[in-house]
């Protein structure tokens, strides 16, 4: 259905809308209109403010409609849009004009459910306090205040790749009952501010929301140009690579049963990626040092004025966060202390789903690993890159750009040997 624009002067305040004076263009059916509350989420970055407003609006829209009994092909092509023209609102709260689009809302709603993430918890984790910027290998990378979700800014090409593979991904998640090392994709959005489009993917954080990671590796099983740069190595938590792992004689210490389960899961996931002709993925490996982890860390101040959030969509948010994350009874990580006290290096597996306990007596307290960068398909560009690298390094070199089947075999061989 085509979107239609309503002049700002005559537009009523839509359900979840920011208030009088807004014009909306929406693919969704007409909703019951309500007046907005006074407080509005304040974010220093307009893009982040609009993104969080849009997520709250979207979750509220979904909450008005029961989930479908089954997903249909059209659900994988659907989208929900809203266009806001606001001439009576102050720019320190939200921009005067913006657009927000959610891709395949019913599909991602279903995926969140299969990953045991409640929509209200998803909303609280994303919007109770502003997400913080963190270092990413490429593009913008944000992490939710409770450290359970990551928000990655991606390209329009990545969105197209996600669209083309979403049905296969969903079928695989259904088949494996959500028990996978693949990224848990939870939402896909477009935010338009000042006529500039930004694309956001929301995923579950692969690292612990409670335990800090002290060493981090990005492993592909390739050895050519797979060493962290000097610039990277001086960072507080550098992303090290395959050659760094070998040069440091790093090993992963987990029990035999945990190793068996992990490798079986990894092999199954990689076989799925080969079927989709996907390559260039990595194993993201994070290691928590139990000795360093027991040292007290300073808590940063909480900016209460930036923690105010009424939901903007007739969803009254929880009170402002006080203290460190992980103490709230709401949000994805909110129940961490409600079952039992956690000792040094311990975690709740239903929250830190990518975690594996280290073997008894191991120098590390916990290991976190999952597959990342799974959107690269072996297309004409990759074929050309493979040919160029083969000429430069020779046919036998361990370059990263190879056929998907060859990439998978080399990757699995390398990962199988990282354990003590």
Swiss-Prot record:
Top-level taxon: Eukaryota
What does it catalyze? a 1,2-diacyl-sn-glycero-3-phospho-(1D-myo-inositol-5-phosphate) + ATP = a 1,2-diacyl-sn-glycero-3-phospho-(1D-myo-inositol-4,5-bisphosphate) + ADP + H(+); 1,2-dihexadecanoyl-sn-glycero-3-phospho-(1D-myo-inositol-5-phosphate) + ATP = 1,2-dihexadecanoyl-sn-glycero-3-phospho-(1D-myo-inositol-4,5-bisphosphate) + ADP + H(+); 1,2-dihexadecanoyl-sn-glycero-3-phospho-(1D-myo-inositol-5-phosphate) + GTP = 1,2-dihexadecanoyl-sn-glycero-3-phospho-(1D-myo-inositol-4,5-bisphosphate) + GDP + H(+)
| Top class in the EC scheme | transferase
- InterPro entries listed in its UniProt record: PInositol-4-P-4/5-kinase_C_sf, PInositol-4-P-4/5-kinase_core, PInositol-4-P-5-kinase_N, PInositol-4/5-P-5/4-kinase
Instruction: Specify the PIPK domain's residue ranges.
Output: 43-419
Q: What keywords does the record list, in alphabetical order?
A: Acetylation, ATP-binding, Cytoplasm, Endoplasmic reticulum, Kinase, Lipid metabolism, Nucleotide-binding, Phosphoprotein, Transferase
Question: What biological processes does GO assign it?
Answer: 1-phosphatidyl-1D-myo-inositol 4,5-bisphosphate biosynthetic process; negative regulation of insulin receptor signaling pathway; phosphatidylinositol biosynthetic process; phosphatidylinositol phosphate biosynthetic process; positive regulation of autophagosome assembly; regulation of autophagy
The entry's function note states: Phosphatidylinositol 5-phosphate 4-kinase with low enzymatic activity. May be a GTP sensor, has higher GTP-dependent kinase activity than ATP-dependent kinase activity. PIP4Ks negatively regulate insulin signaling through a catalytic-independent mechanism. They interact with PIP5Ks and suppress PIP5K-mediated PtdIns(4,5)P2 synthesis and insulin-dependent conversion to PtdIns(3,4,5)P3.
Please state what the protein is called.
Phosphatidylinositol 5-phosphate 4-kinase type-2 gamma
Look up and give the organism this protein is from: Rattus norvegicus (Rat)
Organism lineage string: Eukaryota, Metazoa, Chordata, Craniata, Vertebrata
Q: Which gene encodes it?
A: Pip4k2c
């Amino acid at each position: 259905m085509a979107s239609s624009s309503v002049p700002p002067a005559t537009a009523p305040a839509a359900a979840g809308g920011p208030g009088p004076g807004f014009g909306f263009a929406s693919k969704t059916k007409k909703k019951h209109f309500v007046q907005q509350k006074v407080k509005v989420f304040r974010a220093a970055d307009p893009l982040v403010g609009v993104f969080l407003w849009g997520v709250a609006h979207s979750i509220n829209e979904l909450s008005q409609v029961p989930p479908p009994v089954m997903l249909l092909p059209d659900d994988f092509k659907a989208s929900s849009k809203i266009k806001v023209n606001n001439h009576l609102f102050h720019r320190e709260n939200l921009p005067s004009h913006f657009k927000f689009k959610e891709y395949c809302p019913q599909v991602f709603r279903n995926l969140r459910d299969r990953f045991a993430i409640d929509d209200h918890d998803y909303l609280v984790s994303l919007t109770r306090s502003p997400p913080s910027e963190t270092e990413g290998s490429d593009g913008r990378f944000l992490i939710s205040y409770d450290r359970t979700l990551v928000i990655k800014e991606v390209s329009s090409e990545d969105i197209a790749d996600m669209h083309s593979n979403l049905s296969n991904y969903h079928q695989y998640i259904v088949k494996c009952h959500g028990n996978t090392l693949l990224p848990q994709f939870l939402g896909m959005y477009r935010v338009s501010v000042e006529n500039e489009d930004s694309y956001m993917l929301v995923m579950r954080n692969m690292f612990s929301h409670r335990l800090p990671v002290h060493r981090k590796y990005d492993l592909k099983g390739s050895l050519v140009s797979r060493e962290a740069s000097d610039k990277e190595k001086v960072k507080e938590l550098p992303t090290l690579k395959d050659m760094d792992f070998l040069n440091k004689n790093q090993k992963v210490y987990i029990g035999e049963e945990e190793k068996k389960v992990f490798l079986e899961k990894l092999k199954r996931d990689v076989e799925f990626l080969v079927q989709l002709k996907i390559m260039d993925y990595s194993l993201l490996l994070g290691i928590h040092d139990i000795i360093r982890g027991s040292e007290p860390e300073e808590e940063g101040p909480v900016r209460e004025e930036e923690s105010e959030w009424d939901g903007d969509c007739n969803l009254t948010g929880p009170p402002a966060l006080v203290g460190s994350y992980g103490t709230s009874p709401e949000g994805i990580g909110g129940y961490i202390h409600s079952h039992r006290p956690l000792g040094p290096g311990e975690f709740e597996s239903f929250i830190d789903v990518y975690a594996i306990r280290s073997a008894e007596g191991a120098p590390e307290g916990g290991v976190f690993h999952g597959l990342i960068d799974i959107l690269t398909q072996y297309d004409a560009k990759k074929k050309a890159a493979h040919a160029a690298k083969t000429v430069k390094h020779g046919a036998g070199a361990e370059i990263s750009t190879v056929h998907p089947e060859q990439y998978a075999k080399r990757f699995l061989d390398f990962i199988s040997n990282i354990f003590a």
